[in-house]
From Swiss-Prot:
Free-text comment on the cofactor: Binds 2 [4Fe-4S] clusters. The clusters are coordinated with 3 cysteines and an exchangeable S-adenosyl-L-methionine.
Function summary: Catalyzes the radical-mediated synthesis of 7,8-didemethyl-8-hydroxy-5-deazariboflavin (FO) from 5-amino-6-(D-ribitylamino)uracil and L-tyrosine.
Disulfide bonds: none
Species annotation: Mycobacterium tuberculosis (strain ATCC 25618 / H37Rv)
Residue sites binding [4Fe-4S] cluster 2 per the record: C558, C562, C565
Domain of life: Bacteria
Protein name: FO synthase
Length: 856
């Protein structure tokens, strides 16, 4: 491969050797590398000091690990040799404006310079499509969207350009352009727009098979110290960038990340960066490739005089990346930032992917470094003993995994370009095809599950992808252990003193006093329950209320990855099903005939549910039974609908209200504390978004219930914090109709089966939670509901004597708790609910969803 003009081999001094990196320590680390042992952070930093024969030894170990991974993945080329992959791409620099000031960057500019160059603030749609069309003619499969971070946050010109064209953000424009590229050219977008939130990535996933963001470094020193590489760049905060990696994992997005080598980081910081990537991938399995990129100084930047990364330093880092990240990770090095000889050396150090290489567009981030010609790169790869094969923007294992990783709205575009046997790219030119929402969901699968769950039970004990759907169980158990360590061993506040305080002002105690009440046992617990029962009597009297309703869980297809949930199935599982809109309406009519005043509709987050699906269900029920109260869609379902529609939360909720939605269930809350929440669930909405959705629903006239699921990995301090969140919302909106404590049903829960959760709450926990809720919510939420489905009749009666006043509903069918292993049935008649109340000497009364009492 000829050396391009101006391309010099890198030959610079090695970084300062860490004090611990003496010869004997290095020999020990190299021996561990030869033995296939994963290097810890200190060992990785020491290994990066290897030079000469030691470096050759290190690279040989890394190459063996790489080859083992390629063999395991079946990654062979046309000649039968192991294969190194690349993606044939076009580079689309959507905008060169950015709110950051990275000291090494020439990609980013300012509006004045763009104007002087005669360039637009953003690439116009026609420009983007022209590049993509020409790329398709060259056989490119990937459209790399690269741009600065949130330019509209800094530049008035960016805000004006977007506003004139009807976009509220750069990411909205990127999404629209990705759809146009898919539809008009068939190229697959790979989105690299910098830092994104959970909601933003949720919105972008349906238009791109993969996304990416370089972690670069975990060094806070480089971020916080004036004059260093990332100072003055808010989006280069390592904590923020690690959060992006985590959110991408929670959303099951095939994600590219990596590190920059030689921007002023120490070897220990470099090693820590690799381990941070390893930890994120271990938990979620979503990091599809790690780019190890060598720093190249550029003229007219603050770091123009900073030395390039030395080649031995670079090779050692690549080798260590391979050893830390293991055989299954694709390790990538940009071939245009090194010479041909150095490319061969990188292969020897464990590289197995060249990343995106364009036969058409320059590397706009490194414009002084042209891409090697593809035939030249293939020749270099062959000289190193490997075939070079073309892949898609998503690595093969994610392509072949299907709906678990690739959204169905872009799945067809991926399938059109993928070899079904390997997941690599087919030798075809892309062709545009429609990007559209799925059609109406048809009825299929075990649609009788609601009725059959009580007589026939489940067909399978667990869903088919139990081993892969929820992330790494070892990592999850470590998080549970950390939660347990932080749980208080004793309560300093005296329970009797807390009781006296609660008697004087139930809603005015300190958190410490509430925690004391929550941990009470024995006679103290009896006193807490008695106080709660007294408050109940004062607020709502002795009547036990209930609603005649029907649960309609319209689908159990879900890929969110809630680790506590035994209801969710993947498509094709023996217990999986979806109801058609017509079947849902039929069940609402059946409920009406049986005397129901409410249907409660919730379902899994099925990626094939059309954007109109939620409103269609509401309209169908209202058309069949105009008087039926529709209580439907958890905040997670609302977040999903908002993501699909592109509307704001407020706009989408108003649309549902106009379709006939009456109230929403305040489910999907679990525990409103993210340290617990991210153990319980992989991909569910974060606490802040749950609060925003519920608050907005109340503001547009959609009242809701409120809930808390307890008895898994939580502790009493989480109960207090959760109830405080609900109190704050109620103070602002007054929109909660009731509070429903939901005991964790453990029997079939993946989290419990993996040994990470308790076997549900104890009887003490149940009594304490119901009583605590009555006390803490006094004066704010009058109705405390207890779940006969989860507790059974006798324990339900105990809760009614300790603060609760409501039995929930008749349900008619219930699949969520029953699939989790609840043994208390899925339906109660009115007579049976009345009998529960009369069994403790209390009258029962039917109510509406919003607690208006109905005539006896």
């Amino acid at each position: 491969m000829p050396q391009p003009v101006g391309r010099k081999s890198t030959a610079l001094p090695s970084p300062v050797v860490p004090p611990q990196a003496n010869a004997s320590a290095l020999r020990r680390v190299l021996r561990r590398a030869r033995d296939g042992v994963t290097l810890n952070v200190d060992e990785a930093a020491i290994a990066m000091t290897a030079r000469g024969d030691e470096l050759a030894d290190l690279c040989a170990s890394a190459a063996r690990v790489r080859d083992a991974g390629l063999v395991s993945a079946g990654r062979h080329g046309p000649s039968g040799r192991l294969a190194i992959s690349y993606s044939r791409k076009v580079f689309i620099p959507v905008t060169r404006l950015c709110r950051d000031n990275c000291h090494y960057c020439t990609f980013v500019t300012v509006p004045g310079k763009l104007r002087a160059q005669g360039s637009s603030t953003y690439m116009e749609p026609d420009e983007i499509l022209d590049v993509a069309r020409r790329g398709a003619e060259f056989g490119c499969k990937e459209a790399l969207f690269t741009l600065g971070d949130r330019p509209e946050a800094r530049w008035r010109q960016a805000r004006e350009w977007l506003g004139e064209r009807g976009y509220d953000s750069t990411l909205s424009y990127v999404r629209a352009m990705a759809i146009r590229v898919l539809e008009q050219t068939g190229l697959l977008p790979h989105l690299n727009p910098g830092v994104m939130s959970w909601s933003e990535m949720s919105r972008l996933k349906p238009v791109a098979p993969s996304m990416g963001m370089m972690l670069e470094t975990t060094s806070r020193r480089l971020f916080e110290t004036k004059g260093l590489a990332h100072y003055g760049s808010p989006d280069k905060d390592p904590a923020v960038r690690l959060r992006v990696l985590t959110d991408a994992g929670r959303l099951s997005i095939p994600f590219t990340t990596g590190l920059l080598v030689g921007i002023g980081e120490t070897l220990s910081e470099r090693a820590d960066t690799l381990h941070a990537i390893r930890k994120s991938h271990k938990e979620f399995g979503h990091i599809q490739e790690v780019i190890v990129q060598n720093f190249r100084a550029k003229e007219h930047t603050a770091m123009a005089a900073f030395p390039d990364a030395g080649i031995e330093d670079y090779l050692a880092t690549v080798a260590v990346a391979r050893l830390v990240l293991g055989p299954g990770m694709r390790i990538q090095a940009p071939p245009n930032l090194v010479s041909g000889d150095e490319c061969r050396a990188l292969v020897g150090a464990g590289v197995d992917d060249w990343g995106g290489v364009s036969p058409l567009t320059p590397d706009h981030v490194n414009p002084e470094r042209p891409w090697p010609a593809l035939d030249e790169l293939a020749a270099v790869t062959a000289e190193a003993g490997y075939d070079m094969v073309q892949r898609l923007t998503a690595q093969p294992k994610y392509v072949q995994a299907g709906a678990a990783w690739i959204d169905p709205r872009v799945r067809g575009h991926v399938v059109a370009l993928a070899d079904p046997a390997t997941g690599l790219a087919r030798d075809v030119n892309p062709v545009g095809m429609p990007w559209q929402e799925p059609d109406d969901v048809a009825s299929w699968g075990r649609v009788d599950l609601g009725a059959a769950i009580d007589t026939q039970g489940r067909n399978t004990a667990v869903r088919s992808d139990l081993a892969s759907a929820f992330g790494d169980w070892e990592s999850i158990r470590e998080q549970v252990h950390e939660l347990a360590v932080r749980a208080p061993e004793r309560i300093d506040t005296d329970v009797l003193a807390a009781l006296r305080s609660a008697e004087r002002a139930p809603a005015g105690c300190t958190d410490g006093e509430y925690l004391a009440l929550a941990t009470a046992d024995g006679p103290a617990l009896e006193a807490v329950a008695a106080l709660a029962d007294s408050l109940r009597r004062d607020v709502v009297g002795d009547e036990v209320t209930f609603v005649v309703n029907r649960n309609i869980n319209f689908t159990n297809i879900c890929y969110t990855g809630c680790r506590f949930c035994a209801f969710a199935q993947r498509k094709g599982d023996a217990d999986a099903y979806s109801l058609s809109v017509g079947e849902v309406a039929d069940r609402a009519w059946e409920a009406h005939v049986a005397g129901a005043t409410e249907v409660c509709m919730q379902g899994g987050i099925d990626p094939e549910l059309p954007v109109t699906g939620y409103a269609d269900l509401v309209r169908a029920v209202k058309a069949r039974v105009p008087s039926m109260h529709v209580h439907a869609f958890s905040p997670m379902e609302i977040a999903n609908g908002v993501t699909k529609s592109g509307l704001s939360i407020r706009e989408w909720l108003i649309g549902l209200r106009e379709a006939g939605l009456d109230t929403i269930p305040g489910t999907a809350a679990e525990i409103l504390d993210d340290e617990v929440r991210w153990v319980l669930t992989k991909g569910k909405l974060p606490t802040s978004l749950w609060i925003e959705i519920v608050t907005t629903a109340h503001e547009v006239g959609l009242r809701s219930s409120s809930t808390m699921m307890y008895g898994h990995v939580d502790s009493p301090r989480h109960w207090v914090a959760h109830l405080n969140v609900l109190r704050d919302i109620q103070d602002r909106t007054g929109g909660f109709t009731e509070f429903v404590p939901l005991p964790f049903v453990h029997q079939n829960s993946p989290l419990y089966l993996a040994g990470a959760a308790r076997p549900g709450p104890s009887h003490r926990d149940n009594r304490a939670v119901h009583a605590l809720a009555r006390i803490m919510l006094h004066g704010r939420i009058s109705h405390i509901q207890t779940s006969w489905v989860k507790l059974g009749v006798r324990r339900t009666q105990v809760m009614l004597e300790g603060g609760a006043n409501d039995l929930g509903g008749t349900l008619m069918e219930e699949t969520i708790s029953r699939m989790a292993g609840s043994e208390h049935g899925s339906a109660k008649t009115v007579a049976e609910l009345v009998a529960i109340a009369e069994g403790i000497g209390r009258p029962a009364r039917q109510r509406t969803t919003t607690y208006a009492l109905l005539a006896a």
